[in-house]
Amino acid sequence: MNYDVVIARYGEIGLKSSKVRARFERKLVKNIKAAIDCEVDRNQGRIYIFPKNYGECLENLNKVFGVVSYSPAVSTYGNYEDIEKTLGEYVDNLVDDGFIGKDTRFAIKCRRVGNHDFTSQEMAAFCGSVVVKKVGCPVDLTNPELKIYVEVRDDEAFIYHEKIDGPGGLPLGTQGKVVVLVSSGIDSPVAAYLMMKRGCEVIALHCDNAPFTGPKVHENFDKIIDQLQSYAKGVPITKKVVKYGEYLQQAKDCAPEKMTCVLCKSGMYKIAEKLAHKYGASAIVDGSSVGQVASQTLSNILATRHGVDMPILSPLIGLDKLEITRIAEDIGTFEISKLDDGGCHAVPKYPETKADVDRVEEACRAMNQKEAIEKAFDSID
């Protein structure tokens, strides 16, 4: 098929006010151009992409947030004669590619924008007759095996038969910055992805727990960020690493051992908050899911967030491990996250699962947490 345009559609952007909608459209176009070598036109709720490489376009458009669906199409003039000629050629290609034959039930879906001397129904009936004459296949408006779409917009027409799902969401970079705590595990990369899908620019903060973790953890983190960068065209992820091993050692030496994981998470939040203030981010994000591990009981979630004034968002909070894993598989981070990296050896045998604010504050004082956080923060690279 000799496509000459790809039609991209957005969803909730269209529900915004005209001013916000225009701003979001401009950002979406900018991100599309960052992902694809192309020219782009905007017109009445559609984005028309003219790529130099159609294979690259179809592959990368699936990773541009804000795009709900897209269709490779052929264009022509919006009159009966040109539509008949172009549709006939289009159907010939569908026959050659095995999409339609004399027994294929089909339907024409026509949409029209602008002033014309025909209605959408009249154009649909006309296009249907073109297909029947070409192939001899039956029309079935109720349960068609193939839908052929004809969009007539002012003096142009577009013909296509596929609607490919995009990632949806909002254009990346329209909702401000967030600091995401990203490990080499399964959950936090998914949390970062979901915040990107909601339009947030991501600053990924990784806590390097060496010597309690091995070099594989850091290597896998780098691979995960590289994979997530494929969804961040136009607004790349900023990667930051804090040396966190000394903080953990101080927590283990000065506070009850069972509080290690609680103090670890508390320190992460406070370092992330300082980083957020430095880079103008508005929230902290983590991969917490209620009850999944010891540090994610409701008691611990409350206690570890004490002393942090910035919003802490947990997009996975109500998802189970299977749901999170499915998303990780879809976005390409699961195969990296499941690699054996040795884990963290600072985890106590019996971690605290019912922490309260008073005991956490006492443990923070015992380890001189404020000083330890300042020292760790200065190590961020």
Curated annotation (Swiss-Prot):
The keyword DNA damage does not apply. PROSITE patterns: THUMP. It is an enzyme of class 2 (transferase). Catalyzes the ATP-dependent transfer of a sulfur to tRNA to produce 4-thiouridine in position 8 of tRNAs, which functions as a near-UV photosensor. Also catalyzes the transfer of sulfur to the sulfur carrier protein ThiS, forming ThiS-thiocarboxylate. This is a step in the synthesis of thiazole, in the thiamine biosynthesis pathway. The sulfur is donated as persulfide by IscS. Its main location: cytoplasm. GO terms for biological process: thiamine biosynthetic process; thiamine diphosphate biosynthetic process; thiazole biosynthetic process; tRNA 4-thiouridine biosynthesis. HAMAP family: ThiI (MF_00021). It comes from the Archaea. It catalyses: [ThiI sulfur-carrier protein]-S-sulfanyl-L-cysteine + a uridine in tRNA + 2 reduced [2Fe-2S]-[ferredoxin] + ATP + H(+) = [ThiI sulfur-carrier protein]-L-cysteine + a 4-thiouridine in tRNA + 2 oxidized [2Fe-2S]-[ferredoxin] + AMP + diphosphate; [ThiS sulfur-carrier protein]-C-terminal Gly-Gly-AMP + S-sulfanyl-L-cysteinyl-[cysteine desulfurase] + AH2 = [ThiS sulfur-carrier protein]-C-terminal-Gly-aminoethanethioate + L-cysteinyl-[cysteine desulfurase] + A + AMP + 2 H(+). Pathway: Cofactor biosynthesis; thiamine diphosphate biosynthesis. Its EC number is 2.8.1.4. This is Probable tRNA sulfurtransferase. CDD domains: PPase_ThiI, THUMP_ThiI. One of its GO terms (cellular component) is cytosol. GO terms for molecular function: ATP binding; CCA tRNA nucleotidyltransferase activity; tRNA binding; tRNA-uracil-4 sulfurtransferase activity.
